[in-house]
């Protein structure tokens, strides 16, 4: 079990940094162009995505040691998550309440199918649909801090079922890969149907 840690206040810290930059701009002590550029970075969606993933990993990683050790390990894990998404959408954190009606989405793929695990359907009117943060085509990277990259389908299902109260998902949107995966599965199903039809026809001709 991960040790209890003080919750992070990174959003508050970023807001304070932005306020400081605004004061420095008014003072005229530093070149305003550079200050404005830094302010835009801190207020960007990319910075928010990094902060959300960092906070999610910091809260859930099972790490013992000082706050400095924990922060260093979390930073490495955050960099790894964004490096893995290079060329794709950046990771996002989606938190959903866990209720008796389920989470309201389906997944497909897994190690046994030689593919990532994907959100294949968001059920209309379900929890995920009402929340609005999850999309068909999202690749599932982790469930409550446990990575499911390279894992079997059943591992992700077990983690989702075991979640209590709420579930935090780290996902990234790569719909093209899902479409390719679905096309591959459909091709395999069509080949099986043709084979079954051929076998049935052969049996009929013998009869």
UniProtKB/Swiss-Prot annotation:
<keyword id="KW-0268">Exocytosis</keyword>
<keyword id="KW-0472">Membrane</keyword>
<dbReference type="GO" id="GO:0007043">
    <property type="term" value="P:cell-cell junction assembly"/>
</dbReference>
<dbReference type="GO" id="GO:0030165">
    <property type="term" value="F:PDZ domain binding"/>
</dbReference>
<dbReference type="InterPro" id="IPR051109">
    <property type="entry name" value="MAM_complex_regulator"/>
</dbReference>
<comment type="similarity">
    <text>Belongs to the lin-7 family.</text>
</comment>
<dbReference type="Pfam" id="PF00595">
    <property type="entry name" value="PDZ"/>
</dbReference>
<dbReference type="GO" id="GO:0019901">
    <property type="term" value="F:protein kinase binding"/>
</dbReference>
<comment type="subunit">
    <text>Forms two exclusive ternary complexes with CASK and CASKIN1. The brain-specific heterotrimeric complex (LIN-10-LIN-2-LIN-7 complex) composed of at least APBA1, CASK, and LIN7, associates with the motor protein KIF17 to transport vesicles along microtubules. Forms a heterotrimeric complex composed of MMP5, LIN7B and PATJ; the N-terminal L27 domain of PALS1 interacts with the L27 domain of PATJ and the C-terminal L27 domain of PALS1 interacts with the L27 domain of LIN7B. Forms a heterotrimeric complex with DLG1 and CASK via their L27 domains.</text>
</comment>
<dbReference type="GO" id="GO:0008582">
    <property type="term" value="P:regulation of synaptic assembly at neuromuscular junction"/>
</dbReference>
<feature type="domain" description="L27">
    <location>
        <begin position="10"/>
        <end position="65"/>
    </location>
</feature>
<keyword id="KW-0628">Postsynaptic cell membrane</keyword>
<dbReference type="GO" id="GO:0016323">
    <property type="term" value="C:basolateral plasma membrane"/>
</dbReference>
<dbReference type="GO" id="GO:0015031">
    <property type="term" value="P:protein transport"/>
</dbReference>
<protein>
    <recommendedName>
        <fullName>Protein lin-7 homolog B</fullName>
    </recommendedName>
</protein>
<feature type="domain" description="PDZ">
    <location>
        <begin position="93"/>
        <end position="175"/>
    </location>
</feature>
<dbReference type="GO" id="GO:0097025">
    <property type="term" value="C:MPP7-DLG1-LIN7 complex"/>
</dbReference>
<dbReference type="GO" id="GO:0098839">
    <property type="term" value="C:postsynaptic density membrane"/>
</dbReference>
<dbReference type="InterPro" id="IPR001478">
    <property type="entry name" value="PDZ"/>
</dbReference>
<feature type="short sequence motif" description="Kinase interacting site">
    <location>
        <begin position="1"/>
        <end position="13"/>
    </location>
</feature>
<dbReference type="Pfam" id="PF02828">
    <property type="entry name" value="L27"/>
</dbReference>
<dbReference type="GO" id="GO:0006887">
    <property type="term" value="P:exocytosis"/>
</dbReference>
<dbReference type="GO" id="GO:0045202">
    <property type="term" value="C:synapse"/>
</dbReference>
<comment type="function">
    <text>Plays a role in establishing and maintaining the asymmetric distribution of channels and receptors at the plasma membrane of polarized cells. Forms membrane-associated multiprotein complexes that may regulate delivery and recycling of proteins to the correct membrane domains. The tripartite complex composed of LIN7 (LIN7A, LIN7B or LIN7C), CASK and APBA1 associates with the motor protein KIF17 to transport vesicles containing N-methyl-D-aspartate (NMDA) receptor subunit NR2B along microtubules.</text>
</comment>
<feature type="region of interest" description="Disordered">
    <location>
        <begin position="187"/>
        <end position="207"/>
    </location>
</feature>
<dbReference type="InterPro" id="IPR014775">
    <property type="entry name" value="L27_C"/>
</dbReference>
<keyword id="KW-0796">Tight junction</keyword>
<dbReference type="GO" id="GO:0099092">
    <property type="term" value="C:postsynaptic density, intracellular component"/>
</dbReference>
<keyword id="KW-1003">Cell membrane</keyword>
<keyword id="KW-0813">Transport</keyword>
<dbReference type="InterPro" id="IPR036034">
    <property type="entry name" value="PDZ_sf"/>
</dbReference>
<dbReference type="GO" id="GO:0048489">
    <property type="term" value="P:synaptic vesicle transport"/>
</dbReference>
<keyword id="KW-0770">Synapse</keyword>
<dbReference type="GO" id="GO:0098793">
    <property type="term" value="C:presynapse"/>
</dbReference>
<dbReference type="GO" id="GO:0030674">
    <property type="term" value="F:protein-macromolecule adaptor activity"/>
</dbReference>
<feature type="compositionally biased region" description="Polar residues">
    <location>
        <begin position="198"/>
        <end position="207"/>
    </location>
</feature>
<dbReference type="GO" id="GO:0019904">
    <property type="term" value="F:protein domain specific binding"/>
</dbReference>
<dbReference type="InterPro" id="IPR017365">
    <property type="entry name" value="LIN7"/>
</dbReference>
<dbReference type="GO" id="GO:0007269">
    <property type="term" value="P:neurotransmitter secretion"/>
</dbReference>
<dbReference type="GO" id="GO:0005911">
    <property type="term" value="C:cell-cell junction"/>
</dbReference>
<dbReference type="InterPro" id="IPR004172">
    <property type="entry name" value="L27_dom"/>
</dbReference>
<dbReference type="GO" id="GO:0005886">
    <property type="term" value="C:plasma membrane"/>
</dbReference>
